[in-house]
Amino acid sequence: MKSYIAKPEEVQRKWYVVDAEGKPLGRVASQVALILRGKNKPTYTPHVDTGDYVVIINAEKVVLTGKKLDQKMLRHHSLYPGGLKEVPYKEALAKKPEFVFEEAVRRMLPKGPLGRKMLKKLKVYRGSEHNNEAQNPEVLELRY
């Protein structure tokens, strides 16, 4: 018996909506990353994008446990000497919670062209309103 290998044109994609209000950032991000990769499907193939679309709402109401809100830093480098930029998560969540969510999920996806393609299926919104109602997204209850 041969192993099944999914073809990109055969993949059936669904839309899911996840409410992040009051849930830990890492737990939501890890489950969303699995859905974006397609690991929740029996047709999962590592080198093919078999994942579904995910809409995250209420990104500004996400929770960071412990002292992470004050102590954890969001870092990036300008590629100039001494160009390390650090912003506390408290400020980053206040200014742009969408970016914080996208970064958390991006770091859990594969690096390279396939991971970038998977990340394009993630839509993050600050409040409870989103403009993807036409796709009839299913409400996804997170496991943990």
UniProtKB/Swiss-Prot annotation:
Coiled-coil intervals, chain numbering: none
Presence of the UniProt keyword Secreted in the record: no
Gene Ontology biological process terms from the UniProt entry: negative regulation of translation; translation
GO molecular function: mRNA binding; structural constituent of ribosome
InterPro entries named among the record's database cross-references: Ribosomal_uL13 (IPR005822), Ribosomal_uL13_bac-type (IPR005823), Ribosomal_uL13_CS (IPR023563), Ribosomal_uL13_sf (IPR036899)
Record key words, sorted: Ribonucleoprotein, Ribosomal protein
Gene Ontology cellular-component terms listed: cytosolic large ribosomal subunit
Protein family: Belongs to the universal ribosomal protein uL13 family.
Oligomeric form and interacting partners: Part of the 50S ribosomal subunit.
HAMAP family according to UniProt: Ribosomal_uL13 (MF_01366)
Function field: This protein is one of the early assembly proteins of the 50S ribosomal subunit, although it is not seen to bind rRNA by itself. It is important during the early stages of 50S assembly.
NCBIfam families: rplM_bact
PANTHER family for this protein: LARGE RIBOSOMAL SUBUNIT PROTEIN UL13M, RIBOSOMAL PROTEIN L13
Name the record gives this protein: Large ribosomal subunit protein uL13
Native organism: Clostridium tetani (strain Massachusetts / E88)
Lineage of source species: Bacteria, Bacillati, Bacillota, Clostridia, Eubacteriales
